[in-house]
């Protein structure tokens, strides 16, 4: 009888430890978000990311430093997925999942798709794994966006909106 009670006590403690450790990702300071759109040309584009907030910081200085590689989000790597072979930034890209990284500067951002989509941050990033790299201009957005947000139009225009910054590129 003591063995049965001990077993159930250990099981209950283990279960509560596991559920206590399981993190509700929606309650993170930079919560997860996703956007999926099927374009007019039948390409399904999905972006899975976490949304860092500006919180009064200056983009390019206190957050997403100019000239430095950035994971383009927070927490896990940002993932861009396409269901068909496409052209992005004038370059061909095969259907699949890619890690989305950027190098922001004041006037433009370098957009990078890495063949490795399972990285955390930029620590294990290697340029040899790039599937694509191109530069696109940044602009002042029409409205301030506190939490970084991706928007995809039916024409395949991908827009990163964050603070007063807007970075666009097209998936065709």
Where are these regions (language model features)?
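Residues at beta-strand starts and edge strands
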Residues: 9, 41-43, 96, 107, ...
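Mid-length scaffold segments of soluble, non-membrane domains
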Residues: 71-119
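Short acidic-hydrophobic surface loop/beta-edge motif
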Residues: 9, 33-40, 80, 84-88
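Alpha-helix termini
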Residues: 13-15, 55, 103, 109
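Primarily secretory-pathway and cell-envelope proteins
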Residues: 23-68, 119-172
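Bacterial Sec-dependent N-terminal signal peptides
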Residues: 1-25
């Amino acid at each position: 009888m003591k063995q049965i009670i001990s077993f159930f006590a250990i099981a209950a403690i283990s279960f509560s430890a596991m559920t206590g450790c399981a993190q509700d990702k929606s309650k993170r300071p930079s919560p997860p978000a996703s956007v999926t759109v099927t374009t007019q040309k039948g390409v399904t584009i999905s972006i899975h990311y976490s949304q860092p907030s500006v919180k009064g910081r200056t983009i390019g200085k206190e957050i997403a430093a100019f000239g430095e590689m950035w994971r383009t989000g927070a927490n896990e790597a940002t993932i861009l997925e396409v269901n068909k072979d496409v052209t992005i930034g004038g370059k061909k890209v095969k259907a699949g999942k890619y890690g989305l990284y950027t190098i922001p500067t004041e006037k433009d951002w370098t957009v990078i798709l890495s063949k490795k989509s399972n990285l955390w941050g930029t620590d294990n990033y290697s340029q040899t794994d790039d599937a694509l790299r191109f530069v696109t201009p940044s602009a002042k957005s029409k409205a301030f966006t506190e939490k970084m947000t991706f928007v995809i139009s039916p024409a395949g225009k991908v827009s990163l909106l964050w603070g007063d910054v807007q970075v666009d590129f097209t998936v065709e």
